[in-house]
Design a protein with these regions (language model features):
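Short acidic, S/G/P-rich loop/turn micro-motifs used as interaction or catalytic elements
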Residues: 8-13, 54-57, 131-135, 167-168, ...
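Donor nucleotide-activated moiety binding/catalytic core segment of transferases
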Residues: 37-42, 153-207, 211-214
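Short, well-ordered secondary-structure micro-motifs within conserved domains or adaptor modules
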Residues: 37-64, 68-72, 185-192
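Conserved catalytic-core segment of nucleotide-activated headgroup transferases in glycan assembly
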Residues: 119-169
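N-terminal pre-catalytic "stem/leader" segment of glycosyltransferase-like enzymes
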Residues: 1-48, 52, 132-133, 259-270
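Short loop/turn segments at strand-loop or loop-helix junctions that form parts
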Residues: 3-9, 72-76, 121-133, 163-166, ...
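Leloir-type glycosyltransferase catalytic cores
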Residues: 82-122, 216-270
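A short, gly/pro- and small-residue-rich
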Residues: 54-83, 146-147, 201-215
């Protein structure tokens, strides 16, 4: 069984706001679709299924109760103008589990993603999250941005470019991350965004400044801004292997409904 956390804001009278992506995951898990804004009346053995970082209060309640929760959000890579892939993690918001050294590459190849070799550049690209994402961590976006940029400038004279998170149409059609990273970028600095994975894909070192153990790119990222001028850049083989692992942690809606996603998440063997 599984619980959806829904926040039915002004649903039609007598109806409950549903989420078809979450529904398909629960169907594939042979679960029962239930709706609740709270977990108080739900048996502890029933896991919660949560989509989107705005559900921070329910996530915190699950942690306090010791309840398993499955988190669904945008996939790490392989999405074009439509969101084909959705990442799903258990008791975390990004995959930070074991990175298998000889992970099969079949799912990575299916995404059609091509890696770019490391290319030197001059400017530092800072990619802050949205305030909504920062709310989860109890942080103010502008305050974090000022502290981070000030810290960067203590260690380098390189120009700093801030790329605020725009709407999806802009990010997908007019100013993609690939375009941004092609503009003479030396490295990326972000808080906890999956943009860190994209930075590695397009051949740029990345600094992840969020809490340890919360970013999927962390095994290959930098964390100390004192190294901003000479950051660690993993090999293409290391990046490819990380992506092969992450490809097994993101799923299509069809894979959710068929039960494949549930099986992978609970029987993580190759």
């Amino acid at each position: 069984m599984a619980l959806i956390d829904a926040d039915p804001e002004n649903p039609p009278e007598g109806q409950v706001k549903m989420d078809p992506i979450v529904d398909n995951f629960i169907i594939g898990a042979d679960g029962v679709i239930g709706m609740s804004k709270d977990t108080g009346n739900i048996p502890l053995e029933v896991p919660a299924v949560i989509r989107g970082i705005a559900k921070r209060k329910v996530i915190q309640r699950c942690k306090e109760e010791g309840r398993d929760w499955y988190y669904i959000d945008t996939g790490y890579f392989g999405n074009g103008k439509t969101k084909l892939y959705h990442r799903i993690t258990r008791n975390n918001m990004q995959y930070t589990g074991k990175i298998h050294e000889n992970c099969p590459d079949d799912r990575f190849v299916q995404t059609g993603v091509t890696l770019t070799k490391y290319r030197p550049g001059d400017c530092i690209l800072v990619c802050p999250p949205s305030q909504k994402a920062m709310n989860y961590w109890g942080l103010d976006l502008q305050e974090w941005l000022k502290i981070t940029v000030d810290d960067i400038k203590k260690h380098t004279d390189r120009p700093v470019v801030i790329r605020e998170k725009a709407g999806r149409d802009v990010r997908v059609n007019h100013d993609t991350m690939e375009m941004a990273l092609n503009r003479n970028v030396h490295c990326m600095v972000t808080f906890n965004s999956i943009a860190a994975v994209e930075s590695l894909i397009y051949g740029k070192p990345v600094f992840t400044m969020g809490p340890t153990g919360t970013n999927a790119a962390e095994p290959l990222s930098n964390t100390d801004l004192a190294n901003i001028d000479n950051p660690f850049m993993p090999s293409m083989d290391e990046v490819r292997n990380l992506l092969c692992n992450l490809a097994y942690q993101q799923f299509t809606v069809h894979e959710m409904r068929s039960g494949y996603a549930w099986e992978r998440l609970n029987n993580n063997v190759f």
